[in-house]
Amino acid sequence: RVLGAWTASMAEKPASAAGSDPKREKKRLIVVLERACLETAKVGKDYVLLDCDTHKNFLFKHKRNPADYRPDILHQCLLTLLDSPLNKAGMLQVYIRSERGVLIYVNPQIRIPRTYKRFAGLMVHVLHKLSVSAANGPTKLMQVIKNPVTDHLPAGSRKIAASVKGRLVSLPEFVATLPKDEPAVFVVGAMAHGSVEEVADYTEECVAWSEYPLSGAAALGRLCVAYEQRLGVL
């Protein structure tokens, strides 16, 4: 039986939700990773995070397109974001929304596993238990939270979708036009193909920062660097 389609009605609001954490005032970049492939299923005796390489036969058997199952893209995106100096400076907040609409809060202090196998195990735990806590205390490092994502974004924040089909901009110049003392929200796809516009109807504009298609991780790397330069984070 394939899982992952449940609602998040049992989820709590994260401790750092808008209005409840003074540190949130320091956040300057909020990233929503949309359309992430996060689907679990029982294969053999255990529940696993489905991916196109390991579970190709299972996916064919259930008439699924293996090309759609790329959770490794989310892994790459999270490593790029959370390893960035911007995150280490406390100026970044990340949310994940899966293809099935499951919304996940990511604590900036989490250390994402370096290997995909361990990352997959982490995500199975989060999807089934609705959260994962720090080993040395009750702090939630990842937590399934209630939709819509806009409930967790600062009121009045500018919301921008990233797409190769969007208006082409020089990213450093574009970031320089955003208010320096207010957070902005960038919505970036974490899927193998397609776009985020149809699911990110809460955004106000759509931009591209390369004339060439970029992987999610490459696009996010550029975004973090642009913000680091803008804010003087070395």
Stretches with model-predicted labels:
Residues 192-234:
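Structured adenosyl-cofactor binding patch, chiefly the S-adenosyl-L-methionine
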Residues 182-186, 190:
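Loop/turn-to-beta-strand initiation segments
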Residues 1-5, 203-204:
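Intrinsically disordered, low-complexity basic segments at termini and long loops, enriched
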Residues 4-170, 228-233:
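RNA substrate-binding interface of SAM-dependent RNA methyltransferases
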Residues 43-46, 173-175, 198-201:
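Short coil/turn segments at secondary-structure boundaries
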Residues 8-9, 179, 207-208:
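Preference for well-ordered, secondary-structure-rich cores of eukaryotic proteins
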Residues 156-157, 182, 203-204:
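Short, well-ordered alpha-helix to beta-strand connector turns
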